[in-house]
């Protein structure tokens, strides 16, 4: 088992990377979690992972209650949160209780939000089962729900007690989900580590064929990159914003498309848009733009969206949490892959040109 640490003073926590659930009991002991435990999962993950995970807890001497929520981004809302609260009330929990999120980004986000707000905060553990969650959303403490069609507009920063990654859960994912998760993996390479980006590009076939060694390395490198950013800027006051590369346009597309596209698919489109914006601003060369686009194409992620509604996407971007006054915030590559900067841009023609290019 691989162990990494996210160093945040009194909110520090470990990330464990394994190939099964056999060590999770030891992780609970190390975290000194002694209260009642509740596993939150969704209808998809419940079919494939919950039984094995609950058995691992049982084998380690822990009794776990389980609550299943409907799968899908459309259910990451206050109504589902209310259902979780009602279930927790019935268990008569105290503040020593622990909520454990077994699932992808939706389950992690909503479970973390419930943990942050129930009894003004109870323990929280992330057990991510998708590549997107293992590489990105489970690390860093961002939790929340969507509201009135806007993603993650209600939420908090709330760190887990630990993250437990079983890379073999990825074998149960539909190929589309696995590919969507790779978008966030590519993102980490583009923003901070060109060598890691090249590793991903070279190993796409092995990743999609669930090569265990490659998946473990990717999990380790991803978590290291994200942890290094979060340690310097836990609450997104500056540096952490670079993790939003591809997300300003991506989130807007995701909402306008009514979540018909997966988050990673929208981030893929957003990254292509960000690369083109940097090209139009003469911050990067066309070869670099094509490199990233070709990698995303190789994975099988969308790099164009036929019939994209430029005005709707543009207007939706102004609901972005990172907006500053009337200016939109973009993370753009500077000079090369592996280095980015944050820019505020209010050039409507430029932004619409970028969005329109995604439909060409």
From Swiss-Prot:
Its cofactor is Co(2+); Zn(2+); NAD(+). NAD(+) binds at residues 105-109, 129-130, 142, 151, 169-172. Its main location: cytoplasm. Binds 1 divalent metal cation per subunit. Can use either Co(2+) or Zn(2+). Keywords: Amino-acid biosynthesis, Aromatic amino acid biosynthesis, Cobalt, Cytoplasm, Lyase, Metal-binding, NAD, Nucleotide-binding, Zinc. Zn(2+) binds at residues 184, 247, 263. Pathway: Metabolic intermediate biosynthesis; chorismate biosynthesis; chorismate from D-erythrose 4-phosphate and phosphoenolpyruvate: step 2/7. GO terms for biological process: amino acid biosynthetic process; aromatic amino acid family biosynthetic process; chorismate biosynthetic process. Its EC number is 4.2.3.4. GO terms for molecular function: 3-dehydroquinate synthase activity; metal ion binding; nucleotide binding. It is found in: Cytoplasm. The keyword Cytoplasm applies. It comes from the Bacteria. GO terms for cellular component: cytoplasm. InterPro entries: Dehydroquinate_synthase, DHQ_synth_AroB, DHQ_synth_fam, DHQS/DOIS_N, DHQS_C. It catalyses: 7-phospho-2-dehydro-3-deoxy-D-arabino-heptonate = 3-dehydroquinate + phosphate. Catalyzes the conversion of 3-deoxy-D-arabino-heptulosonate 7-phosphate (DAHP) to dehydroquinate (DHQ). Belongs to the sugar phosphate cyclases superfamily. Dehydroquinate synthase family. This is 3-dehydroquinate synthase. It comes from Acetivibrio thermocellus (strain ATCC 27405 / DSM 1237 / JCM 9322 / NBRC 103400 / NCIMB 10682 / NRRL B-4536 / VPI 7372).
């Amino acid at each position: 088992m691989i162990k990494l640490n996210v160093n945040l003073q009194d909110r520090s926590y470990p990330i464990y990377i394994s190939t099964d659930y056999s060590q999770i009991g030891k992780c609970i002991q190390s975290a000194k979690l002694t209260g009642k435990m509740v596993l939150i999962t969704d209808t998809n993950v419940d079919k494939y992972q919950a039984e094995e995970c609950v058995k691992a807890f049982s084998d380690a001497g822990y009794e776990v209650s389980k609550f299943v929520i409907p799968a899908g981004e459309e259910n990451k809302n206050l109504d589902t949160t209310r259902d979780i609260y009602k279930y927790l009330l019935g268990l008569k929990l105290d503040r020593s209780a622990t909520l454990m999120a077994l699932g992808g980004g939706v389950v992690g986000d909503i479970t973390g939000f419930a943990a942050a707000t129930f009894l003004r905060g109870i323990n929280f553990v992330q057990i991510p089962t998708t590549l997107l969650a293992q590489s990105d959303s489970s690390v860093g403490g961002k939790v929340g729900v969507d509201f009135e069609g806007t993603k993650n507009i209600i939420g908090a920063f709330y760190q887990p007690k630990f993250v437990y990654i079983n890379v073999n859960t990825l074998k149960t994912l539909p190929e589309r989900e696995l590919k969507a998760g790779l978008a966030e993996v590519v993102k980490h390479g583009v923003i901070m580590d060109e060598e890691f980006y090249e590793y991903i590009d070279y190993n796409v076939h092995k990743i999609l064929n669930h090569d265990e060694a490659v998946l473990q390395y990717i999990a380790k490198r991803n978590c290291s990159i994200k942890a290094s950013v979060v340690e310097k800027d836990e609450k997104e006051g500056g540096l952490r914003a670079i993790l939003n590369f591809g997300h300003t346009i991506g989130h807007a597309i995701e909402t306008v498309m009514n979540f018909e596209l997966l988050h990673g698919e929208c981030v893929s489109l957003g990254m292509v848009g960000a690369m083109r914006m940097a090209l139009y601003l003469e911050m990067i060369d066309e070869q670099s733009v094509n490199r990233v686009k070709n990698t995303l194409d190789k994975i099988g992620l969308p790099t164009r969206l036929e019939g994209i509604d430029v005005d709707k996407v543009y207007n939706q971007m102004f609901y972005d949490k990172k907006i500053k006054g009337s200016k939109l915030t973009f993370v753009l590559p500077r000079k090369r892959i592996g280095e980015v900067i944050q820019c505020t841009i209010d050039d409507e023609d430029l932004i619409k040109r970028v969005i329109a290019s995604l439909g060409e």
